[in-house]
Amino acid sequence: MASSNLIKQLQERGLVAQVTDEEALAERLAQGPIALYCGFDPTADSLHLGHLVPLLCLKRFQQAGHKPVALVGGATGLIGDPSFKAAERKLNTEDTVQEWVDKIRKQVAPFLDFDCGDNSAIAANNYDWFGSMNVLTFLRDIGKHFSVNQMINKEAVKQRLNRDDQGISFTEFSYNLLQGYDFACLNKLHGVALQIGGSDQWGNITSGIDLTRRLHQNQVFGLTVPLITKADGTKFGKTEGGAVWLDPKKTSPYKFYQFWINTADADVYRFLKFFTFMDMAEINALEEEDKNSGKAPRAQYVLAEQVTRLVHGEEGLEAAKRITESLFNGNLSDLSESDFEQLAQDGMPMVELEKGTDLMQALVESELQPSRGQARKAIAANGVTVNGIKQPDPDYVLNENDRYFSNYTLLRRGKKNWCLIKWKSK
C-alpha cells in the first residue's frame, strides 16, 4: 500500500469508520513515515477475531513504511474499559493480568516486523508508566486536563449512566484518562502521531488527542475501524461454542478454518477486504468469477486459506485442509495424531469410552442414536461408519484395530453426524 493514498485505500476496503481531520492526516502521511499505535487490553488469555481487523491495520501501515507500536495494556487491563459494556467488568488479579500480557504480546509479535530498519515495530506495555505513578501525580498531571462534563457526555459512558440497573464505578470511569495518557506518553516516547482502534474506542481516542495537545502541544490523529457485523444481523466472530480465538489451544486451526469456510455469500467478499491483503482488483475479479461460474463460490476457500495462514502459519493451514479433506472423503489414514487432537479439542463432538464398548452402546453414548434399538436399526440399514468404513453388524464390538494411535475412533451416522471416541487408558 502506497503511503500517499493509504487512507483512501483503507476506505475502499471499508476499513475506516471514523477519522479525525482526514485532510490533515492525509497530508501528514504524504510527508513521510509516522509512528502509530493500537492498544490491546489483556481481558482474556488470548486475542479473538474482534482484535484481528485493528491488528491487521497496524500491519497495513507498516507495509506502507510506517512504524507500528503494539501496546499491551498491563495497567488498563487491571481497570477494565467500560465502553459500550452493559455491566461492570470483573477485576482480575495482577498475576493473572501479567500472565495474559505475556501471552498477548507473543500473539501479536508474528503479525509485525520487529527487525526491518527505521519502521521496525515496537512492543510497549502501559504498566511501564502507570505502575509507579502515585494517585497525586495522576490527579494533578492528568486529571486536571479532563472535564467531567465532557466525560459523562461521551456515548460509551452515557449508555451506562442511563441504565437504571447499572451505574459506573470511579474505577471504570477513570479508564478514559488512562487510555488518553497512553497516547500522550507514546507521543513523547516514540513520536506516535496516530492511534487506531475499533469504533467503540472513538471516545477514548479523542480524549488522548486532546490530552496530547494540552501536554505536548502536538497535533495527533485518530482512526477507527468498523466493528464487524454480518449481513444477517448476527454477531461476527462467535460460534455456538463461543468466541473464535487466535490461540490454537483455544480454537484449533481446523475449527478456525471451518469458521471461514462457513462464511455467508453475502459477507465473504467484504471479509476478503477486511481480513486479507489481496488487492481490490483480485477480490473484485474473484467475485465476478464466482457470479458467472454457475458453481459454488470459490471465495470462502480463498478467505479460509488466507486468514488461517496469516494466524496459524503454513503448518496450521495444511493441517486444517488435511482434516477437512479426510472427513469429506472418509479416508482417515492421512491424519496425524495432532490432527486427531484438534478434532478432540473442538472439531466435533467427542466422548470418552471404556475399551470393549460395543458399537450400539457407542452410538448411544455419543448421542448419535437415542437408544440401542435405534442404533441397531441404523447399523442394519448400513447407516453407520467406523473410521469411514460401513459396519453392518449390530453386535460389533469396537477393538484395537479400530483405534488410531491407540486412542481415537471416528463414528459417523448418515452423512453429517459425527462423533470422535477417545478411549480411556484404563
Swiss-Prot record:
Its recorded reaction(s) are: tRNA(Tyr) + L-tyrosine + ATP = L-tyrosyl-tRNA(Tyr) + AMP + diphosphate + H(+)
Q: Please provide the Gene Ontology terms (biological process) for this protein.
A: tyrosyl-tRNA aminoacylation
Q: Name one GO cellular component term.
A: cytosol
**Main location (coarse class):** cytoplasm
E.C. designation(s): 6.1.1.1
Protein family per UniProt: Belongs to the class-I aminoacyl-tRNA synthetase family. TyrS type 1 subfamily.
Instruction: Please give one Gene Ontology molecular function term for this protein.
Output: tyrosine-tRNA ligase activity
- S4 RNA-binding domain location is 357-415
| Subcellular localization(s) per the UniProt record | Cytoplasm
Q: Give the CDD domains listed for this entry.
A: S4, TyrRS_core
Q: Where is the motif ('KMSKS' region)? A: 235-239
Task of the protein: Catalyzes the attachment of tyrosine to tRNA(Tyr) in a two-step reaction: tyrosine is first activated by ATP to form Tyr-AMP and then transferred to the acceptor end of tRNA(Tyr).
Q: What name has this protein been given in UniProt? A: Tyrosine--tRNA ligase
Query: Could you say which residues bind ATP here?
Result: 238
